[in-house]
Amino acid sequence: NPTTGSVINFTSAHNIYIDENGIAYIFGLKNNGTWVANRGAVFLDVAANATDPVYLGEWADEYIHDGMVRGDTMYAGCIYQGELYIVDVSDKSNPQTIGQHTTPNNFTHNAWVSDDGNYVFTTDEQSDAYIAAYDISDVNNIQEVDRIQSNPGSNSIPHNTHVDGNFLITSYYRDGTTVHDITYPNYMIQVAYYDSYTGSGDGFDGCWGTYPFLSSGNIISSDRNSNNGKGVLNIYGRAFQQACYLQGNIYDGFTGSPIANANMEILTTTNSETSNLLGYYQSAIVDSG
């Protein structure tokens, strides 16, 4: 029990996140290959002295594989529970779970919150899995609003996703680095990708990490196993732009009533959408304009 002066011994961890206040959140602890009992998240203050961090507390309700923190809220991928957990960490000595939700493939790898704090995006580290978006404006009633695959039917595996403004940038193993426009989180659209691995399908080769927050605007992505069997660091410029969205309502010209199940097509594209019960439709194409 660290509060009585003893220490938490660990020799490795799956991931670490350091927030804007210099608090390190250590996820998935092991000690010489054995899981540490309190392996959810350990909170350490590394701001004053990174070589002699101060223990602040821990959250040990479930195993956390990966997570991030903004302000007083932790967003955690509890992979073996297959759930997104949202935790109030304002009191590091007594963190409290305030919301949770299952993810599409029940193997929640990571989570990242939108800039406005109203949405969270998750990945499931499974074959043919999804990136998913959730409305968390009410943490007591979290709602999935969209899910998307980079290459449907290919069995590729998403790994880590990051929100960068209106874009979602994801390491996607054998599908490389993918970029989705999330201007409308309920209608994500892929606008760019670079596949650094020649193979396809199920497997843990190719891109397994990406970082889009450099001041240069460049994106760095790491391949754990490139085409020659070695790791590679890739640096990408930003040659992508936001998608073009089309949305509206269809009404009966005589009665003014909404028309459901009306088919809407964007000419010269394969896009086809059907209006809902309120006559609403939404579509998008990659090309801006």
Outline where the language-model segments fall.
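Short, acidic Ser/Thr/Gly-rich low-complexity loop/linker segments typical of extracellular
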Residues: 258, 266-286
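Phosphate/pyrophosphate-recognition segments in soluble nucleotide-handling domains
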Residues: 236-250, 260, 286
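Short, solvent-exposed loop/edge segments of extracellular or virion-exposed proteins
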Residues: 151, 197, 249-255
